[in-house]
Amino acid sequence: MKGDLIVLVPDRNTEAAVAGILERHPSLHTRPVAARIIVHPEKDPGCRLHGHELLRLYQNDFRFALLIFDREGCGAEESTRTELERLAEETIASSGWKGRCGVVITDPELEIWVWSDSPRVDQAVGWLGRRPGLREWMQRQGFELTSAGKPLRPKEALEAALRVARKPRSSALYRELALKVGFERCLDPAFIKLKEL
């Protein structure tokens, strides 16, 4: 075996976030994980439709396979996150990974993980010390927030905040957030599932 974990993701931002999360193995209460992260060339739809085919190539090289993609943009938005996860897990398991695979689908998309109440989010986004505060600004801009204080349109809210702060949206931002924001602050069901895998 070449490693512990092969992870298939839809884009570079998810790749950077997952790499940062895996570096924080003490916070995950696990040993260091020998992982390889690959990006599907067909993004979210490719992960959903063909992820099992790509992962099949690695079944003799890694102990566990993980597939991550966004519900929004995957081509099956009418399905729930849990329905999509179940179907994808069944498909991957039947392709040779039975008992050694997991699927995490961000809902609606990866940026939902960005929005915790940590001041590190404001710092990474370039909003530290600004008035009004980031969440108040989002509401003033018309971004509806959930009861947990997360925007219903997390990607659009992040992009708008970065534009105002004149900070580029980059993979480095996702990695920085993954490395600095406390895991206990993220109560998103998909993130909790990722921590438990």
Q: Can you describe what each PLM-predicted range is?
A:
Residues 1-4, 15-38, 51-66, 70-197:
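C-terminal accessory helical subdomains adjacent to catalytic cores in phosphodiester-
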Residues 7:
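Conserved SAM-binding loop
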Residues 10-11:
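Helix N-cap/beta->alpha junction signal
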Residues 38-48:
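Eukaryotic endosomal/vacuolar membrane-trafficking regulators centered on PX-domain-mediated PI3P pathways
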